[in-house]
């Protein structure tokens, strides 16, 4: 009995973080679907699948990274341990606020927020951001309570499987982009520009050396697609 309690108390903070990351990633991925809505989906299966795979994989992975960066230093420094959850919740709310604001800017102007564009925001835009931060802060406080409940009732295996899904989708998205980029298939690669902080993988030289892609064949296929689009 004492051993199980010790194990449970030691795993509780990590369990909370894992479930909080899972819940936050689900919210962020849902909001990120706006980038897919604003994108004109091509007719090919890969062209349709890639935006969804890339959006969920990329935004969920960024979410996990942001929350881990906020949580880990506080947990490693005993004087700051009481701040771990509040700072993680604040980081989640800030990241979601930034994403919503970026999606609004991208839908209107087709570029993402950076320090230069943020400097051009007027008072009403900053006010909107402040309201969103408060709303999302309250949302993530509720999700934090749910994460605590899930950490106490769900198995470690379930959270490990769920936390691995975004990472698998991230790798799959990079693999799809690298393959499409090698084949000069803009119907897939063009969506990567729609996501903020997205730096997709390219591997033309490696795949060509491995014999998986023939550059000349890929070039001809791209020309044929252009002719077909013009017709």
PLM region descriptions:
Residues 197-231:
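Soluble catalytic regions of membrane-associated enzymes that act on cell-envelope
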Residues 2-207:
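Transmembrane and membrane-interface helices of multi-pass
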């Amino acid at each position: 009995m004492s051993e199980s309690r010790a194990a449970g108390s030691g795993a509780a903070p990590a369990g909370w973080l894992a479930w909080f990351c899972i819940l936050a990633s689900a919210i962020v991925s849902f909001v990120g679907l706006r980038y897919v809505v604003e994108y004109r989906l091509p007719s090919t299966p890969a062209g349709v699948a890639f935006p969804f795979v890339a959006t969920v994989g990329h935004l969920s992975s960024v979410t996990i990274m942001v929350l881990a960066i906020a949580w880990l230093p506080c947990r490693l420094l005993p004087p700051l341990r009481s701040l771990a959850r509040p700072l993680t919740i604040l980081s989640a709310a800030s990241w979601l606020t930034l994403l919503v604001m970026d999606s609004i800017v991208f839908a209107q102007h087709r570029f993402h927020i950076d320090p230069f564009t943020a400097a051009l925001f007027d008072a009403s835009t900053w006010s909107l951001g402040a309201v969103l931060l408060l709303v999302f802060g309250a949302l993530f406080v509720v999700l934090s309570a749910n994460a605590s409940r899930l950490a106490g009732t769900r198995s470690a295996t379930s959270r490990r499987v769920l936390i691995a899904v975004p990472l698998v989708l991230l790798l799959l998205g990079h693999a799809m982009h690298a393959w499409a980029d090698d084949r000069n298939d803009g119907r897939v690669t063009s969506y990567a520009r729609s996501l903020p902080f997205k730096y997709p993988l390219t591997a033309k030289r490696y795949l060509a050396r491995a014999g998986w892609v023939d550059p000349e064949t890929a070039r001809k296929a791209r020309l044929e697609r252009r002719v077909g689009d013009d017709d």
